Amino acid sequence: MSAMRIHLPRGGCWPHRLSLAWNIAVLAITAFVSAVWANIWVDSLRDYRPPLAQWDATASDAPAGPALIEGLVLVLLEGVPADYLDRTPALAGISAAHVRMTGPLSSYTPASGWITLVSGASPRLAGAPLQGAADSVLWYARAETLFDVTADAGRQTALYGPVWWRGMVAAAKRSESVLFGSAGEPAALAALAEARRQLESQPPALTLVHVRWPDGFPTASLDDALRGLVRAVEPSRQTLLLAAAPARGTARLMAFGCGIRPGAYTGMRPADIAPTAAALLGVPAPARSEGTIFRSLLAWDAEAEARSLAALAEVRWKLAEAYLAGMGASLDVGPLLGEREAVRQAVGAGRWPAAREGAEKLLAVLDGLMREAYHRRVWGDRLWRLWLPIMYLAGAILMQGRAWRRKELPLAPALITVAAAGLPAVWLTLSRGTRILESFAGWQWVLAGLGAWGTLAGLWGMWVLRRESWDIWERWRRAAGLVQLLAAIWGLPLAFLMWWQGLVVWWDLPAPAGAAAQAVLLTQLAGLCAGGLAGILAAPFLKS
């Protein structure tokens, strides 16, 4: 049998050889990117682990500030209207401390967002999977939570909400919990009723109530149940934190009771909830807390403020040590030992202003080191992948010119396909999704329209292949060129997005933007899989 050789349909001049070589290279790169993306997708669906996944440190041995309250009730309302806290009669007049914050639904699934509220850690640091069913997200999370630090302090906890909180309950040592397997109005009202009975009989130190209200459903029954829960809270000894998260948009936090300074505040982040709650309870912040204490909200003296900030700095020190080691950055907390010791000495000597200022500076420097380690890891991983988008760009440009000269695909539909596939991915990458939270519904229609035009362009090209009087080999060859062209065009923004975001760090996108990016990437994945079909269609080029 003779050796395999490449059959050139139009002679053997070097432009055709070069064009065919580029096609083969693009096919190979497409297969490589498809495999990489498929691995990422499978890992994220199952159990994606960041560099800190094996870090099992806790904050139980860290110091804590003095307790400001005897009990904390944290209520999470999911799916209620954006103005629910302002217009609900059950909440009217009980407090003026309304805190605006970015939505707690800070990842692709609501469960990942609630992890941030109870642990202070982003899903990236919490060890939560990128995607997956809600009942698996909290189960896989490895971050220490308010339940753990409160139980380690010898105090009781209670949880009432959906059954997928079972992983959080299992982590707590002592918990009076009732979990509901179904969502909707009955389960939400039952959770509020169970929490109210517990607060009226033997109130725990920490009570979490999670209500998943149907989007757009009337809230009259919810108002009545919430009114009963509010009446069960004793404001002279307890504090109520109520986070209302609509289906889309900005969440609101209402706080009232002991330890709270009434007023209107802005700038609180979801990651600040856990450290602030820990300061109220007088327990250490969870070990992976990335947020800070929202001090404007708390009614405390100079000693309590200094001790709480110093305790948070100790927890953040351990996190920074593990984070810098996990990210492989050439950064170290060793040079900050002097600042750490100065804060400890100031607390021991009762110099509260000096302790507060030193803890603030230490926290800022530690956070800066972790950000620098993150950026170094991202850019370090981007460098070796820089050739990938360059190869895609060169191959796509060459194939576009070749297809235009051979009239295999009109230029206008091809450009529409580029707009449908590339611009959303690149735009989401550069903006990180922060500017589409309020216009997500309209943006979906734009994506649908552009995607429809791109699909019509591909169908038109296939119709041309069927209409022309070519033999079967010519049709296969031109179909291979068409599929390769579409795969390369759709694969270019995906390659750029993977290069920009990095494979070993978490994708920092809010929920709506993440859903849009996920939809775009899934369509791009379909285009990349079409590259494999192109390889099959190109088989007639190889003859023995």
Please describe what each predicted stretch is.
Residues 7-29:
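N-terminal Sec-pathway targeting helices
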Residues 19-23, 32-36, 167-168, 174-230, ...:
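Anion-binding catalytic surfaces of enzymes that hydrolyze or transfer phosphate/sulfate esters
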Residues 26, 30-36, 43-57, 64-204, ...:
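Active-site-proximal alpha/beta segments of enzymes that process anionic O-linked groups
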Residues 73-76, 87-91, 218-255, 277-281:
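Metal-dependent active-site segment of extracytoplasmic phospho-/sulfohydrolases and closely related
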Residues 236, 241-263, 307-308, 433-441:
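Histidine-centered active-site microenvironments of extracellular/periplasmic hydrolases
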Residues 249-252, 256-294, 298-302, 308-311, ...:
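A post-motif C-terminal structural segment
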Residues 296-387, 456, 490-496:
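Phosphate/adenylate-binding glycine loop and adjacent helical scaffold
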Residues 375-544:
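Alpha-helical transmembrane segments of integral membrane proteins
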